[in-house]
Amino acid sequence: MASTPTLNLSITTPFVRTKIPAKISLPACSWLDRSSSRHVELNHKFCRKLELKVAMCRASLDVQQVRDEVYSNAQPHELVDKKIEERVKYVKNLLSTMDDGRINWSAYDTAWISLIKDFEGRDCPQFPSTLERIAENQLPDGSWGDKDFDCSYDRIINTLACVVALTTWNVHPEINQKGIRYLKENMRKLEETPTVLMTCAFEVVFPALLKKARNLGIHDLPYDMPIVKEICKIGDEKLARIPKKMMEKETTSLMYAAEGVENLDWERLLKLRTPENGSFLSSPAATVVAFMHTKDEDCLRYIKYLLNKFNGGAPNVYPVDLWSRLWATDRLQRLGISRYFESEIKDLLSYVHSYWTDIGVYCTRDSKYADIDDTSMGFRLLRVQGYNMDANVFKYFQKDDKFVCLGGQMNGSATATYNLYRAAQYQFPGEQILEDARKFSQQFLQESIDTNNLLDKWVISPHIPEEMRFGMEMTWYSCLPRIEASYYLQHYGATEDVWLGKTFFRMEEISNENYRELAILDFSKCQAQHQTEWIHMQEWYESNNVKEFGISRKDLLFAYFLAAASIFETERAKERILWARSKIICKMVKSFLEKETGSLEHKIAFLTGSGDKGNGPVNNAMATLHQLLGEFDGYISIQLENAWAAWLTKLEQGEANDGELLATTINICGGRVNQDTLSHNEYKALSDLTNKICHNLAQIQNDKGDEIKDSKRSERDKEVEQDMQALAKLVFEESDLERSIKQTFLAVVRTYYYGAYIAAEKIDVHMFKVLFKPVG
């Protein structure tokens, strides 16, 4: 056997920004065919630009040329590491100083606070800073609202509130007239703006402000415009459907916009305010009206807190402490950079869990109210973190065969339903409520996709449709970490995302350009490492004559891709390479065992090196295995030999325990296990369940394209689903075993699930995106 080039796995390669190599050996692939020098058409619908990049790849093997191409485009890794370090430091500070959450101010809510009269009876506002804040922030066209996203609903509701405030106190007349002119000229745009962009409770608070404006004698506004009358009519009908006694008895979603509801008994409503901060559903405007009617000290304390924190202004909703912590964690995880912030994320989720209730959570702590969006996100993240989460929390949102988003409101939100769908996938055995939630959310989202109705009423993001289509195609079982990151880098809106409350607003801890920049740097650095490792994998393939076992380069690429998409960190190169090579060696050993007729003892002798190895494929297979084991010293080498010996023994008995072998070798290589761990009852349970699932998934993968009875396929799919739920329970629940050990089993099983259920043409696309396509 030819000598194999040595790859020093303890050293990570410099960061490189590569072009697609002109010559890279990826034969037997639908988009790279080694048998022909002609460019092959893609099986998947790439965009034209991507097709041209792929077409640059040719099938001839020229490892040195690839290496030259990689390093000719290299960016000094010291510079990249410095950029990563700077952004990590920034994000760590952002997360550790989150407090009640970061959100921009709202002209609408600030205007409502300005209406509070002087406590000593003078004809002036109690908080004059609010009027100055309003005057200083008028936009050039005379409106107030989000300066980067011109939406009629947002601009008009903010501007109308500010005009009412300035007119009430007869200040800044020029600014006020400019605002009135804007309203007069732009109110008609409400007819043209899609209703999905309507701010929350617009049909309730808009008529209330119009009434105030009319009472103040602002005669220049188009009160009788048809669209204005229509909106007022819709608001009246909505209020007529909700009995005021219900609002006074329990917290409903309408409490968030209570400033738009007349003739409420505010003394009775006081019992519904949040005890800790004195607000009504964390809404400054609603709390202002409550204070005006009751002079409640807790409401006043909340208002003063906001003015102090937001420099004389107020946001649309506050606090947003739970919301910020949950969504920040989600973004960092999906972007593939959460490992930099493990301690911070642990603290964030511990904080959320401390405020968890039997009905879930709202955007802020200590609320008597809950919504399905925050509850779904919190349930999923906390369950994965190891907290004991009761799935029955979702019964609070179940109404017949549907799930509602907010109390008293039917859920029509794509993003909230999508988060419910994501949470429902983390089902443990026997959790029927999550099965119901999954079916409902899956049907809702599929219908939305089919009708191209994926615009959302809580957030404006250009990438929501693509994100949800991808999420429907790739469940979390099959969505390997680096595949998820490669796509979410496309879907993450960063500062492009705009959130919808009663006005538009932005949240720095959720939508942050630094997250994206860090994710691009990290992905590119890891990808450069993976490309170098792939070069060495090809050298290893050639040197060990792997081809003679019927194993193609496409098989080699797929094996390495699965490892790199699951264990992607640069510092885990040894585990990644061991995973990929072990998978190939399993195929090599199985190949010659199918032909070898010797006894079990004879075959074991091959493994231990004590027998006559003979010539040809048998010699190559065993020599390759011995070479792999020889790269490790001492106790690790002995553990690996024992693992392979156990695998070979089971193989001879007709049990293909590849999943257990891969998980155990990875755990051994990572230094996470010893003999006591390997003999632990839970470790054995994980091994047995992993073997069962991987066996069934391998059969499903082998049956792709075959004529299999639907009943048989459905039965096997159902068994896999039940076993995956059991595995999730073993992995996520707290136990004596380290989480990292259990996570390895899950990582291996997910690659089998991916291979079984993802179409070949999709796999080709994923391999290209993860290993070869530059990001950013």
Swiss-Prot record:
Tissue expression as described in the entry: Present in both leaves and flowers, with higher levels in leaves.
Binding site for substrate: K238, K457
Enzyme class: lyase
Gene Ontology CC annotation, any one: chloroplast
FT transit peptide: 1-17
GO biological process: gibberellin biosynthetic process
Main location: plastid
Pathway: Secondary metabolite biosynthesis; terpenoid biosynthesis
Described function: Involved in the biosynthesis of labdane-type diterpenoid including marrubiin and other labdane-related furanoid diterpenoids with potential applications as anti-diabetics, analgesics or vasorelaxants. Terpene synthase that produces peregrinol diphosphate from geranylgeranyl diphosphate (GGPP).
Family: Belongs to the terpene synthase family.
Domain remarks: The Asp-Xaa-Asp-Asp (DXDD) motif is important for the catalytic activity, presumably through binding to Mg(2+).
Protein name, per record: Peregrinol diphosphate synthase CPS1, chloroplastic
Organism: Marrubium vulgare
Organism ancestry: Eukaryota, Viridiplantae, Streptophyta, Embryophyta, Tracheophyta
Protein encoded by which gene: CPS1
